[in-house]
């Protein structure tokens, strides 16, 4: 009789181990993004909120801006843990230094879903293929310059997305021996104001520039504003994002900004949340890192572009 009981207990335990984890309710989400003032992150938050409310109409969503400050973002993650969030949706401001904070969150039983930028240790990551985005934007430059000229790169914060874009740009330009990169280490902070300030300095420093690659659209807009202020119009500008302001610039036909490798922040962040919920429910994704292809937007095809503000 005892033997039979032991066998039954053993069988029950084995069956329990084979069963999938019980579904957990999605009650609270914490979102930390690089800069809330950037329309890109407005679209990501909407993508997360819309997908979350499909799962639980009463879900609580807490959105905060790290302002590209690592210490601030680490503090935000600590606050999310203390608040008992189920998932942290993370746009890391530093692709490497954020790792201990991610580890701490997961040790507390919180799922971390990274979007737009990789974060070491995150359960899932969804982002644009940023190497390809930088490559496409700078292939456009090389083509328009006929493989010859002087180019500046306006860099940004040390996130993986920006590092990858610059890498892709350099790889594209590096195929042309007669293209010279005059500067690639000036940080425009991913903002219009930063792009303006950096471009003012570059225009003062260099008498002739043939093209500018800006790591995102706000930076590109700031660069164009600086050029107008200093009466410089000899160069073209390309970027990455496909933001609403860039749509208008491309459609106008009279902007120095000629192309942007577009992203879909709404879809990107929503997909990251979906994968995060899968992890929350004990289902490990087959592909924990998902790369989305960019689309190069120019004056020639902008009319067919479904942008960030399009109806969903």
Model-derived features with residue positions:
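A residue-level marker of the well-folded mature domains of exported/periplasmic proteins
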Residues: 3-8, 17, 22-312
